[in-house]
UniProtKB/Swiss-Prot annotation:
Coiled coil: none
Subunit structure: The complex is composed of two ATP-binding proteins (PotA), two transmembrane proteins (PotB and PotC) and a solute-binding protein (PotD).
Organism expressing this protein natively: Mycoplasma mobile (strain ATCC 43663 / 163K / NCTC 11711)
Gene3D superfamilies per the UniProt record, alphabetical: 2.40.50.100, P-loop containing nucleotide triphosphate hydrolases
Region forming the signal peptide: none
Protein name, per record: Spermidine/putrescine import ATP-binding protein PotA
The keyword ATP-binding is assigned to this record: yes
Reaction catalyzed: ATP + H2O + polyamine-[polyamine-binding protein]Side 1 = ADP + phosphate + polyamineSide 2 + [polyamine-binding protein]Side 1
Length: 473
């Protein structure tokens, strides 16, 4: 019988497929992860409300928000530790919400490391590798032909099932259009649609699951001990833990444990690495080292990182884009620079960094009024005489004891090492300013700024202006 052969020596290195190579199998250039109309509820409480977002391959994404905003829930939904009530979780265009965590293209690092204390560093890293399979290098042509025939049968079955579900869902949606439905009937039909959508997700992945099962049985093999040892060595070098393979977990520092957790997750070659506040328990110096390590590894391996944190500085320094979450909704999803310089609304401006916020009136093109004076602005996108929110960042304000646009009085200052954070009262509005020069309490000073330093936003109610943040000041 003819066969397809190559070197099968146990000393050869197993085929290592990086996430960047896998993404090249995505000819339509689809997002690696897409959440579409995701809703998550616990009883009567809505945790996520109709979330939509799209993440590109090889991005470093940070989910940032206050406690209870829903950021960890988003991560858990992507990882398969939670299931949505409705909506789609798409991986390269295919809904994976029905798949359990071990069938998803992701690996997760938790805040508490989740290492096995009875295993050594090497044992922890090998844990996932013992389940990993690599393609056989000597497969009979008849076996490949059988596999191809089975794939065609599986595809036909899946297509028929999805067509049936399409018709069922359309029927339910038509029934939902009736104005005569009671709330109970409407809820019942919506639940049927939600349940059938999970069935649809299963059949979307049916062929891949069958192919994996067949391949594991007939077309692949487990890694040899030598191959696992090589991968462990490679991972320890990657996370700078050479020489610690035999170390006991309880003998490691917090930073070293986090590196082991990182090595274990990367060893199984996920497309997506999910990180749930992994650095929050580390001291400042070790935390900075781990931030650099994560950034370097993400760039080197060209993986997609989705990182949850409450640390704004960490998010700005590490991310390609940041998802700002508030009360189960996405307030803004943009680059760190755009979120800082051009926040969507007053809440985002207040949440990210120091902010000088006050009510203003957009008078006409390039003219805005606040604090009883009229100033020039770069903005041209509002209707005349519209009430808006105005933002000036502390570092954009120029302080002088001689002249400026407005006059104020120094009320408080905090020394930050290379600069001072100074509070200046202007017309009963408290300004926060960064300055390298020291000013005495109650000293009169003048403030000015460049034309493009004033950012105008649509008026947002229910969020205070210039609320003093004691953690920041």
């Amino acid at each position: 019988m003819n066969s397809i052969s190559s070197n099968k020596s146990n000393n050869s290195k197993p085929p290592r497929v990086s996430a960047s190579k896998i993404s090249k199998l995505n000819p339509k250039n689809l997002p690696i992860i897409e959440l579409k109309s995701i809703t998550k509820e616990y009883g009567d409480k809505t945790i996520l409300n109709n979330i939509n977002l799209s993440i590109k391959d090889e991005e470093f994404i940070t989910i940032l928000g206050p406690s209870g905003s829903g950021k960890t829930t988003i991560l858990s939904l992507i990882g398969g530790f939670e299931y949505p009530n409705r909506g789609e979780i798409k991986f390269f265009g295919k809904d994976i919400k029905d798949l359990p965590p071990h069938k998803r293209p992701s690996s997760t690092i938790f805040q508490d490391y989740a290492l096995f204390p009875h295993l050594s560093v090497e044992g922890n890293i090998k844990y996932g590798l013992k389940l990993k399979r690599v393609p056989l290098t000597d497969v009979k042509e008849l076996q490949l032909k059988t596999f191809e025939n089975k794939v065609n049968i599986w595809k036909k079955t899946a297509d028929e099932k999805m067509l049936q579900l399409d018709k069922i869902q359309e029927d339910y949606r038509q029934k939902l259009q009736s104005s005569e439905l009671t709330e109970k009937q409407r809820s019942k039909f919506q639940k049927w649609i939600d349940d059938s959508d999970f069935h649809y997700s299963y059949w979307e992945n049916y062929v891949d699951l069958k192919k994996e099962s067949y391949s594991n049985k007939y077309l692949s093999r487990k890694l040899t001990n030598k191959e696992m040892d090589d991968i462990v060595k490679e991972m320890l070098e990657l996370v700078s833990l050479e020489g610690h393979a035999k170390s006991a977990i309880q003998n490691l520092s917090g930073g070293q444990k986090q590196r082991v957790a990182l090595a274990r997750s990367l060893a199984i070659e996920p497309n997506i690495l999910l990180l749930d506040e992994p650095l929050s328990a580390l001291d400042a110096k070790i935390r900075q080292q781990m931030q650099r390590l994560l950034s370097n590894i993400q760039k080197e391996l060209k993986l997609t990182f989705i990182f949850v944190t409450h640390d704004q500085k960490e998010a700005i320094e590490l991310s390609d884009r940041i998802i700002i979450v508030r009360d189960g909704k996405i307030e803004q999803f943009d680059t760190p620079k755009n979120i800082y310089d051009f926040p969507k609304n007053k809440w985002v401006a207040n949440f990210i960094g120091y902010s000088n916020l006050f009510e203003a009136k957009y008078l006409e093109k390039n003219k805005v009024s606040f604090l009883g004076k009229t100033f020039d602005t770069v903005h041209t996108n509002f209707e005349n005489n519209t009430i808006v929110d105005a933002l000036i960042r502390p570092e954009d304000i120029i302080v002088s004891d001689k002249e400026g646009l407005i006059k104020g009085k120094v009320k408080e200052w905090v020394y930050k090492g290379s600069y001072y954070i100074t509070e200046i009262l202007v017309e009963n509005v408290l300004f926060i300013v960064e300055s390298t020069k020291f000013y005495d309490i109650d000293q009169d000073v003048y403030l000015s700024w460049e034309l493009d330093s004033v950012h105008l936003m649509e008026k947002m109610e229910g969020v205070s202006d210039n609320a003093k943040d004691t953690e920041k000041i």
